[in-house]
């Protein structure tokens, strides 16, 4: 059913200035709760499985899960009742594996891209007291093995022969793994069965369902404090940490969401599932859509053809990350950059639409038909709400998105450890560059960060700390990291530095030397620097990145003699390509200005990153050679000989900005 675009102001423009509940400690809450208790319960719902079960009882014949086998094919749908049949068959089938009933670990790995089988397997686990452990490729092979061993995964559901082969190849180093359930055809399974031998049993998902149907059992979910998911972080600080998410956490975040969006999102809505289900954000979104009884259509599995999925599904709610919205923005401006008239027309149309949007009026206009219709068609033409998370979104991109889609764009902030939003802008927030007020399920305060000389009460800046039922209790089998995450008063320390800007929360930094890229991936620069410093060409290196860029960059202080030798062995294509003559004795400044020297060092970084099996997003894509070494005297090194990152970032701010502006250096 089509949900018409409103031609008047949306009805969820709540006051969004945080309410200061405790002035002495600086504790702020949502203006929706003020002095009332936090919103963390739902009437008639105790656990996540209740959400699904209640919707099945309320609207059994309504469509729930959709998919299409080819890009040109229309979506096919399973009803809530049909999905429930498969969920109970799946859960009953999983209980036929004795490892899940006799061993202490009740964890099941899900190693797949978003698909109906992923959601059915997850619900099947929750219905029968099993714990879901998502796995994903960007973790890297070593991290994958660590998770499988720490969670003692005896059963893993995976979606492709390639992923199944990865597991089989590593089976000797993952002794708990006994069964792989595959979401592909039986014909593709035979070669893998031969490779697995007797070590690992392999069956198809349909065979699992058949076993469950033959041995159907009554659902037996865990209680409110029962563990439902262990979501591992991407391991940027070393070994991945498993966030323990229980029923109580997810119910609290859904309760808070219902308080904010309950009058706007309905059972008539449709969402495209393409952001990774291995991350908590997409799981949270789909649980809430399940709560209201809406539809979830899965993408075809290829991120490059998501636009085809969108056109065919025609979703009403679009979940995104800033990088994708920036790509839309860049593509539009790239297409019109050669035409002065088109640039003028677009700017004028955006100005006119923004006048309407600023008044919270989201109706179709002349400019939609004339200018924005082609963009809207790429998204199916029905989007009426855009939800963005993962990294900050630039204000021009935010205004552009609001105008083009002619709908509210809500920018949220949260992390795995908070199971979803900590705060969010609302439809009436027009300025951007902030993430709104606290979610109704949490309290927020800023605390001092001594290492950064930040005093929250003095600077209106400090570490963002969160407290509420939606916050996890700790990391799986990791009491040391848990103690660092949650203090004695129950405050969860996010590691992000924030400030209250015009009444709204703004994320401005990281407490530790970790940063997030535009696509939402975290980077630990010291990990990269440790590898790159193995090069004889490098004396010192400083790796940096920010949330508006998709790649890290670096400042490099070169080793003079090895780099001179490399230059002398280099044969430029033309005498003028290198500004350093091989026979001369150039200064370090001359070497750093030489484009050939830069190419040589970049090639070295590429070689080292490949040897270390860096992920694509971890590889430095642009560098600047600098002649002044980092030292204690110039404040670029700490007394313990560590790089003073804030000082280096401040000293080379202009150079770093230029590295992001330049195209990544070809490698």
Annotate the PLM regions.
Residues 63, 182, 202-203, 210-232, ...:
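Conserved pre-ATP/AMP-binding loop-to-beta segment of ANL
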Residues 72-80, 91-139:
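Conserved AMP-binding/adenylate-forming
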Residues 77-81, 228-254:
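Conserved AMP-binding A3 loop
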Residues 84, 88-89, 210, 243-264, ...:
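Conserved structural elements of the adenylate-forming
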Residues 200-203, 316-319, 328-430, 443:
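Gly/Ser/Thr-rich phosphate-binding loop
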Residues 452-517:
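Conserved ATP-binding/catalytic segment of the ANL
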């Amino acid at each position: 059913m089509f949900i018409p675009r409103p031609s008047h102001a949306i009805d969820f423009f709540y006051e969004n200035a945080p309410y200061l509940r405790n002035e002495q400690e600086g504790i702020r809450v949502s203006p929706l709760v003020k002095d009332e208790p936090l919103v963390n319960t739902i009437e008639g719902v105790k656990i996540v499985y209740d959400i699904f079960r209640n919707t099945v009882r309320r609207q059994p014949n309504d469509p729930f899960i959709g998919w299409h086998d080819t890009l040109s094919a229309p979506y096919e749908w399973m009803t809530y009742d049909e999905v429930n049949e498969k969920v109970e068959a799946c859960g009953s089938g999983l209980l036929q594996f004795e490892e899940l009933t006799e061993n202490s670990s009740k964890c099941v790995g899900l190693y797949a891209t978003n698909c109906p089988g992923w959601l059915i397997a997850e619900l099947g686990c929750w219905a029968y007291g099993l714990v879901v452990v998502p796995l994903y490729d960007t973790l890297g092979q070593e991290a994958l093995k660590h998770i499988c061993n720490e969670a003692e995964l005896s059963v893993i559901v995976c979606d492709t022969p390639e992923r199944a082969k990865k597991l089989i190849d590593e089976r000797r180093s993952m002794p708990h793994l006994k069964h792989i359930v595959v979401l592909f055809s039986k014909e593709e399974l035979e070669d893998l069965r031969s490779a697995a031998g007797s070590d690992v049993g392999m069956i198809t998902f349909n065979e699992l369902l058949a076993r469950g149907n033959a041995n159907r059992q009554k659902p037996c979910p865990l209680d409110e404090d029962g563990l439902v998911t262990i979501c591992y972080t991407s391991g940027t600080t070393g070994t991945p940490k498993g966030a323990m998410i229980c029923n109580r956490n997810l119910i609290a975040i859904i309760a808070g969401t219902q308080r904010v969006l309950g009058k706007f999102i309905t059972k008539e809505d449709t969402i495209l599932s393409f952001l990774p289900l291995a991350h908590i954000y997409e799981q949270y979104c789909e649980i809430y859509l399940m709560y209201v009884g809406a539809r979830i259509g899965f993408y075809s599995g290829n991120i490059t053809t998501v636009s085809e999925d969108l056109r065919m599904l025609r979703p009403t709610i679009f979940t995104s990350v800033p990088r994708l919205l920036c790509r839309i923005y860049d593509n539009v401006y790239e297409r019109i950059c050669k035409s002065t008239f088109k640039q003028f027309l677009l700017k004028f149309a955006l100005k006119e639409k923004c006048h309407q949007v600023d008044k919270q009026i989201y109706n179709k206009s002349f400019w939609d038909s004339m200018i924005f219709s082609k963009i809207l068609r790429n998204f199916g033409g029905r989007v009426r709400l855009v939800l963005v998370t993962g990294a900050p979104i630039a204000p021009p991109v935010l205004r552009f998105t609001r105008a083009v889609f002619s709908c509210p764009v809500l920018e949220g902030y949260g992390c795995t450890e908070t199971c979803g939003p900590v705060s969010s802008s609302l439809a009436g927030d027009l300025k951007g560059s902030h993430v709104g007020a606290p979610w109704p399920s949490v309290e927020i305060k800023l605390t001092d960060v001594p290492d950064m000389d930040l005093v929250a009460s003095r600077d209106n800046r400090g570490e963002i700390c969160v407290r509420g039922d939606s916050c996890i209790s700790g990391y799986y089998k990791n009491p040391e990291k848990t103690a660092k995450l949650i203090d004695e008063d129950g405050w969860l320390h996010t590691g992000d530095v924030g400030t209250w800007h015009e009444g709204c929360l703004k994320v401005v930094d990281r407490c530790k030397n970790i940063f997030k890229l535009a696509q939402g991936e975290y980077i630990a620069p010291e990990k990269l620097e440790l590898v790159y410093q193995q090069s004889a060409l490098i004396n010192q290196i400083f790796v940096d990145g920010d949330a508006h860029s998709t790649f890290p960059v670096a400042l490099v202080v070169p080793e003079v003699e090895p780099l001179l030798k490399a230059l002398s062995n280099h044969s430029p294509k033309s005498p003028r390509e290198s500004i350093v003559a091989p026979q001369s004795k150039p200064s370090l400044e001359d070497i750093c200005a030489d484009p050939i020297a830069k190419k040589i060092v970049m090639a070295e970084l590429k070689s080292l990153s490949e040897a270390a099996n860096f992920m694509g997003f971890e590889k430095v894509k642009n560098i600047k050679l600098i002649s002044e070494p980092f030292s204690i005297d110039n404040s670029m090194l700490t007394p313990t000989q560590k790089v003073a990152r804030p000082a280096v970032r401040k000293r080379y701010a202009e150079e770093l900005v230029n590295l992001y502006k330049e195209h990544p250096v070809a490698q």
